[in-house]
Amino acid sequence: MTLREDLTKAVEEINAYYKELEGESTRAAVILATCSLEDELAKLIRFKKFPRECNDDTWDIIAGPTAPLGSLKNRANFGFAFGLYGEKTKEIIKQIGVVRNKFAHWTNARDFHHPDVMRETEKLKNNVISSFHVGPSEPPLVIRQQFLWLVQTLEDRLERVRGHIEELDGPLTPLP
């Protein structure tokens, strides 16, 4: 493939992702956004902590679905342990995973007003990345938008950490 074809494909994939994210149910949107965050976290860990010689087969042994780095929680802990971000970011990532799991594994959790989803989402309201309002008086669609904004903002910040080259970019302000 040429560079133009690669870029065209990447743009098409990004557009399809956002179209799907906007048009899906709350359950699907939360799962999809969190999967994207999880993928970025895996890229960050692989790029920053594993040698270039770590091929896809080896990476699957390390980070495949049933591997030690196969879960969002384990990836969050690993990234923190190796100094890719601070304790607060680790806890935010893990809590996003808890909310995602409520939607993924509970058939009656369809929006953010489900009591268990609300309780877990409230733990994110004062986070240092993108705080937001959560509560029974907030419309579920507003909570959804704020939650997705948090996930996307965190994913973008992790991507910046992954792409940062200190010799070229200078010191990086670490994630809390």
What positions do the PLM features span?
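Amphipathic alpha-helical interface elements
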Residues: 1-176
